[in-house]
Amino acid sequence: MSWFLVLKCLLTVCIISHLSVSSTESYGCIRKTCFGGRCLHNTTRSCEFSKGCFSQLQEFAVPLLLLNRRVEQRGCSEDNCTELAFSATLGIDWMFSYNHQCCYSEQCNNKPINVSPLSLQPNGVECPTCYSELGTCRPVSLKCTGAQTTCVNVTGQGIREDFIKIHAMGCATQTACNLKNVIILNNIKIDTSCVSGSPPLRYSPSLSTDQKTSSATAPTLCLLAAVLPAIMVMESFSEL
């Protein structure tokens, strides 16, 4: 075989290999962001060398305040996609659920996504619970329910608003343990650690009445501050 034919064969193999790699690593992912049922956009984005498509749903609720919000996102994963689903009950009555799913084919993230419903059935575990942006908080005992069988400690900080500094405790699923730099609500980066069983309460120094009020209302204020940029974007989009 002549050198010309050898080089031609090698070139053909290289081209086929390149096309094969491109076809497996480049595909379209649905791109959508929704807050409270209002969606900013719903398009297909080609994700070259994508690490996968993702679908994410976050839901937080404060039943005492009749507050319930859902944040849904879909798009291309910037890094290797890792699936994660967890739920937690923190503070007085603040419930949070998170579900992040991955897939690896054309528009595969167009399927409906949900979070597991929270059970009200006590499971025998009791955890210290509190929520504060003041650095310390006075925990009270919380009877855990359903799959939330571990006691979690959460620290967090705002990404765009660095004045948001969270310390919280409560009940959580096992999957909420030992999280590092997980971003929730697009604006808060959290770390978590867990303690199994029902640990004893360890009270911080007594808080003033104003501090207790701030601690009780902090979940709502902080979350509203976190999602406010998204609301403003939605409003601007609706006016176009």
From Swiss-Prot:
Instruction: Specify where it is mainly localized.
Output: secreted
Question: Which residues, if any, are the signal sequence?
Answer: 1-26
CDD domains registered for this protein in UniProt: TFP_LU_ECD_PINLYP_rpt2 (cd23572)
GO biological process, any: bone remodeling
InterPro entries this protein is in?
Answer: CNF-like_PLA2_Inhibitor, Snake_toxin-like_sf
Annotated Gene Ontology cellular components are:
extracellular region
Post-translational modification remark: N-glycosylated.
Asked whether the UniProt record includes Plastid among its keywords, one would answer: no
Question: Which cysteines form disulfides?
Answer: 47-76, 81-102, 103-108, 127-151, 144-171
| Database matches in SUPFAM superfamilies | Snake toxin-like (SSF57302)
Q: Which residues are glycosylated?
A: 42, 153
Keywords from UniProt, A to Z, are: Disulfide bond, Glycoprotein, Secreted, Signal
Tissues with expression: Expressed abundantly in bone, including the lengthening growth plate where cartilage is remodeled into bone.
Induction statement: Up-regulated by estradiol.
**Which cellular compartments is it found in?**
Secreted
The function of this protein is: May play a novel role in the growth or remodeling of bone.
What does the similarity note say?
Answer: Belongs to the CNF-like-inhibitor family.
The record's section on PANTHER family has: GENE 12253-RELATED, LY6/PLAUR DOMAIN-CONTAINING PROTEIN 8
Name the UniProt record assigns to this protein: Protein RoBo-1
What taxonomic ancestry is recorded?
Eukaryota, Metazoa, Chordata, Craniata, Vertebrata
